[in-house]
């Protein structure tokens, strides 16, 4: 069956968006708020009608992820910020495979996410309460699967409990995107053998987004 590279690219951009937000948080203590909302909201939507619907139904919601994806696909340097983004992206893919193969882990994750939906009736998505709850899901369900993702950045920034919670919640969103990526036919071999196809698709999507003013 022919691969749907549009859906694969969107899901891959979702992983990369989480990677970029984690990087911003770790270095600066804050990140693109709109992109963060899109990524966190993707965790909550358990029954989306399409791949794009996971990310709010708009390609523009993945602008950060698509731009990051192009950087990761075309990274010539093994050092610096691009290397960090590549490491986070690949690490999320590895953890997703462990999640999918661990007995009962996906069910546990689903049950815990259902609990978030109840909390959303009383608290905002980006409230400290929800951030802490999503971070706890990451720590309880994802982290034990190993290997842990080593987040690098400013030590002073990373000491903040609020930043730690946001980073873990954002990594959980990355896992959500990685699960979606496999569901729509994504696989790590594509990063080696279909790099040009993915690059072209990402550029096409970005090309018809309205430019940021």
UniProtKB/Swiss-Prot annotation:
InterPro entries: HflD, HflD-like_sf
Membrane-related topology note: Peripheral membrane protein
Entry function: Negative regulator of phage lambda lysogenization. Contributes to the degradation of the phage regulatory protein CII. Acts probably by holding CII on the membrane surface, away from the target promoters, but close to the FtsH protease.
Pfam families assigned: DUF489 (PF04356)
A single Gene Ontology CC term: plasma membrane
Location of this chain's protein in the cell: Cytoplasm; Cell inner membrane
Entry coiled-coil feature ranges: 79-126
The protein's name: High frequency lysogenization protein HflD
Name of the gene encoding the protein in the UniProt record: hflD
Disulfide-bond pairs as recorded: none
Source organism, top-level taxon: Bacteria
Upper classification of the organism: Bacteria, Pseudomonadati, Pseudomonadota, Gammaproteobacteria, Enterobacterales
Swiss-Prot/TrEMBL GO biological process terms: response to heat
Source species of the chain: Escherichia coli (strain K12)
Stated family: Belongs to the HflD family.
HAMAP family: HflD_protein (MF_00695)
Disruption phenotype: Cells lacking this gene show an increased lysogenization frequency.
PANTHER family reported for this sequence: HIGH FREQUENCY LYSOGENIZATION PROTEIN HFLD (PTHR38100:SF1)
Quaternary context: Interacts with CII protein from phage lambda.
Chief place where the protein resides: cytoplasm
Keywords: Cell inner membrane, Cell membrane, Coiled coil, Cytoplasm, Membrane
